[in-house]
């Protein structure tokens, strides 16, 4: 089917335009119509993306469904997917209908709320399918705007502060990437991402001030420029401080999208740009990345143990889990990269579900303070069961997708650096500590607080939202080859080219 990627990318945008231009009036009927238009658009987008998945050839590691048209000023509108990017497209289209359904109770500026999420979906998909530097940057940066509005308009009491902190961190982190893109165009004469993957950027060591030499030279500088953007987006320690504030102030649906998809743009960027385009720079900075990741895993896990706000605890948990992802990516072997991608997919399901779990009781009690709860199992048995399932999955219980991602990632890291891997393994114990501590305080114990004695269990709508997330977490936990077979050839191609480039450069250096 021609133009399938364009259809998937811009279908939510078309629905947003319909809501903005056609939808008139206000009141309950207009709000209900806006919700149904948004839900229908996201469901249709997911169904169309299934056609993409059905027609995808996993054995082909190259780009598929490529669309390439001349655009402006010599630039090209070019889209395509490989085994890595198609997974993130599917994650996005799978989660968005659930996100819209979780926002069914919203009553303030409903039409605008739905438009913001539809625009955000289109921009997120665009990031994963763009094959032109400028197009990628436009999608990558434009995605800040709807998320900024979602936090700033529909967020909590400190929403303005959190929205601006989110915007400034992520925007300023991308400034260096823009400068690097201009430099890449001047050196390579193209903005085509596939072409740039095979371009040999200068890598000779650069002397500074006569006493210090930058290994990898220009490649390392380009790597660091992209690293600044992707590290903030993931986020990595110590540029993670915007995330807890953003999660705490964002509405539930905003937290789901932020944790499940937006953070993955950083990991995707490392896979699409950092490793294939700047192998010498990546190799030079690998130890640095390992150290930051290991510190993130342990430090943010310890910080999570001290939290009294449920959303903030889960936010710090996300930073710790992304530490495993960056370790796996920069291990640069099949198991490590497979595990990192699997971990990102799994984290999308599990973290999204955990934020939904917080949203369920927040809608009833209007507080996220852990101390305000206790004994919920006595009034909300279905909620207690679902919350326990995703708590165990977040810890990495065998049989869930959380276990597979962590196991593969650690397996890959052990092959590269045993000490770092052992240090990172301690994070598994810490994650069990904070996750079970949260669950015990919220769900177990006596139901002594009067305000909780009339709380109702989950509705049918809420259970229906969780059902697909439970199914995917279990399915990928017992049958992980559904993912590894899809991404395997593309990951193998990435890893082989990375090491081949390093080997070729090493031989050239030795010859000189």
Swiss-Prot record:
Pfam families listed in its UniProt record: Proton_antipo_M (PF00361)
Keywords from the named record: Cell membrane, Membrane, NAD, Quinone, Translocase, Transmembrane, Transmembrane helix, Ubiquinone
Membrane topology reported for the UniProt record: Multi-pass membrane protein
Reaction(s) the record says it catalyses: a quinone + NADH + 5 H(+)(in) = a quinol + NAD(+) + 4 H(+)(out)
Subcellular location: Cell membrane
Name of the molecule in the record: NADH-quinone oxidoreductase subunit M
Family, as annotated: Belongs to the complex I subunit 4 family.
Keyword NAD: yes
Entry's transmembrane regions: 3-23, 36-56, 84-104, 112-132, 133-153, 166-186, 208-228, 251-271, 285-305, 313-333, 341-361, 384-404, 419-439, 464-484
One annotated GO biological process: ATP synthesis coupled electron transport
Gene: nuoM
Lineage of origin: Bacteria, Pseudomonadati, Pseudomonadota, Alphaproteobacteria, Rhodobacterales
Keyword Cell membrane: yes
Enzyme Commission numbers on file: 7.1.1.-
Enzyme class: translocase
Function: NDH-1 shuttles electrons from NADH, via FMN and iron-sulfur (Fe-S) centers, to quinones in the respiratory chain. The immediate electron acceptor for the enzyme in this species is believed to be ubiquinone. Couples the redox reaction to proton translocation (for every two electrons transferred, four hydrogen ions are translocated across the cytoplasmic membrane), and thus conserves the redox energy in a proton gradient.
Any GO molecular function: NADH dehydrogenase (ubiquinone) activity
GO cellular component: plasma membrane
